[in-house]
Design a protein with these regions (language model features):
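A short, N-terminal "cap"/entry segment at the start of jelly-roll beta-barrel domains
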Residues: 1-31, 116-141
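A generic "binding-loop/recognition-motif" signal
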Residues: 18, 40, 51, 70, ...
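Conserved short histidine dyad/triad with adjacent acidic residue
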Residues: 34-49
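A short hydrophobic beta-strand segment most commonly corresponding to one strand
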Residues: 35, 55, 81, 96-112
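Short beta-strand His + acidic residue motifs that chelate non-heme Fe in jelly-roll/DSBH
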Residues: 45-47, 65-66, 82, 88-95
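Glycine- and acidic-residue-biased ligand/ion/polar-headgroup-sensing regions
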Residues: 51-53, 58-63, 68
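Structural motif
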Residues: 62-64, 71, 87, 98
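Short acidic-glycine-tyrosine-enriched beta hairpin
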Residues: 69-84
Length: 141
């Protein structure tokens, strides 16, 4: 059994937003759970994933969510599903509050070695570098 309080996760920043790693891929081999806080008026960079799907659980705030060519406004509490190989991004539409959601990434066939090489911190450092090359803010890794 694995139980962790949100306060026990490890915080990090990426593309101007704050995250807390709760359940790293290193410990599961098949999934990952991360809290994400999007600053007022902020967005996540557009991205997609070849080998995993994601579930977003919104619990505070309002967002515009783009998934696979469709945009929808979402008010917490709400849930969204992002299939593999589908471009997606999230925008906090509120100017005075953070958007809070939990995303759960699931690899149905297990996490490929190249997506866990060096541990989750190394994987996210590569993601941050990728976003920086596209002009998104560079944060501490």
């Amino acid at each position: 059994m694995f139980i962790r309080q949100f306060s026990e996760g490890e915080p990090f920043r990426c593309a101007g937003n704050e995250f807390v790693m709760l359940l790293p891929r290193d410990e599961t081999g098949a999934c990952e759970a991360v809290l994400q806080m999007v600053r007022p008026g902020g967005t996540t960079p557009p991205n997609s994933h070849e080998t995993f799907m994601q579930i977003y659980l919104f619990w505070a705030g309002e967002a515009r969510v783009y998934i696979g060519g469709e945009m929808q406004r979402v008010r917490a509490p709400a849930v969204a599903f992002v299939p593999p190989r589908t471009e997606h991004w999230v925008e906090n539409v509120l100017a005075d509050r953070e958007l809070h959601y939990l995303y759960i990434s699931v690899w149905p066939d297990g996490i490929p070695p190249e997506e866990r090489e060096g541990g989750w911190k190394n994987v996210y450092a590569k993601i941050i570098d990728s976003y920086a090359s596209r002009g998104y803010p560079v944060d501490a890794k």
